[in-house]
């Protein structure tokens, strides 16, 4: 399975990490405050659907999306288009991302940034904060209840926001149980890669109004965006359709439906 293979490779790396976690947590706690990720989405969604614009060079399912992507340039185009936040892939092996991409993108805009990666250990959580991310991704399908809870609490402790990604009602329940205040609903089935718009629309109504609702994957155009906005989503996380666009500014702007 696609997700299992990626997660296992990340777990293998994490198991060999010899660093002292307490030292790293201390360093993270000493950093200056982050840019408010949830707050940006809460404010923006009062006016229109927010766009979390993703910097993604390639993916296992689609191959190369944007070979010689300039992270600083595309980040500033996303900001010009009205993106509320950035999402940056830092997985090198499967997605061609890097820590450097995240740092460059964040430095070239004023937007909050989520580290998009496969978080499988406490080290991954703390590393996200140390590299400059404002928010970290936790994928419910990849983690046990204990891990989800521990990683979420550690992130909160080091002033790092958390987006918990879910795929179905059971995972949504798990996300809410750990106190997630930003929940993503991934419309793409991780096994078949098919996009299920109906499930995302159905799940929106199950997310409490105090929680920021983000729809992920399979958002291709303004019609998709409008349907998700009508279903109750505050934001869409979009990568492929804007990173491959000849005009990323317009592509982002088009998704910001009122």
Tell me the role of every PLM-derived stretch.
Residues 49-50, 55, 62-163, 169-174, ...:
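N-terminal active-site wall of soluble small-molecule enzyme domains
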Residues 202-206, 244-258:
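C-terminal helical cap(s) of enzyme catalytic domains, especially alpha/beta-barrels
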Residues 95, 165, 214, 218, ...:
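Active-site-adjacent beta-strand anchor residues
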Residues 127-147, 184-193, 233-251:
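Glycine-rich phosphate-binding active-site loops on the catalytic face of alpha/beta enzymes
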Residues 117, 164-165, 185, 244:
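Conserved SAM-binding loop
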Residues 2-68:
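An N-cap/entry alpha-helix motif that binds or orients negatively charged groups
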Residues 120-131, 167-178, 215, 219-238, ...:
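Catalytic cores of alpha/beta
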Residues 182-238:
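Catalytic-face loop-and-helix region of soluble metabolic enzyme cores
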């Amino acid at each position: 399975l696609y997700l299992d293979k990626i997660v296992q490779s990340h777990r293998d790396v994490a198991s060999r990490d010899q660093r002292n976690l307490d030292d790293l947590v201390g360093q993270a706690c000493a950093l200056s405050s982050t840019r408010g990720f949830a707050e940006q989405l809460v404010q923006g969604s009062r006016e229109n659907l927010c766009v979390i614009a993703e910097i993604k060079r390639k993916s296992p399912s689609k191959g190369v999306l944007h070979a010689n992507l300039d992270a600083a340039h595309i980040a500033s185009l996303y900001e010009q288009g009205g993106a509320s936040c950035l999402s940056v892939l830092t997985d090198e092996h499967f997605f061609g991302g890097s820590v450097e991409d995240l740092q460059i993108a964040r430095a070239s805009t004023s937007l909050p940034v989520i580290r998009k990666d496969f978080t499988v250990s406490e080290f991954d959580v703390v590393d996200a904060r140390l590299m400059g991310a404002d928010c970290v991704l936790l994928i419910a399908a990849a983690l046990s209840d204990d891990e989800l809870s521990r990683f979420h609490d550690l992130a909160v402790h080091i002033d790092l926001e958390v987006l918990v990604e879910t795929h179905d009602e059971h995972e949504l329940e798990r996300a809410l149980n750990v106190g997630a205040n930003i929940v993503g609903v991934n419309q793409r089935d991780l096994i078949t890669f098919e996009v299920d718009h109906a499930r995302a629309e159905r799940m929106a109504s199950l997310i409490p109004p105090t929680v920021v609702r983000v729809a992920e994957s399979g958002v291709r155009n303004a019609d998709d965006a409008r349907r998700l906005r009508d279903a109750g989503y505050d934001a869409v996380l979009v990568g492929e359709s804007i990173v491959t666009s000849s005009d990323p500014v317009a592509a982002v702007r088009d998704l910001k439906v009122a």
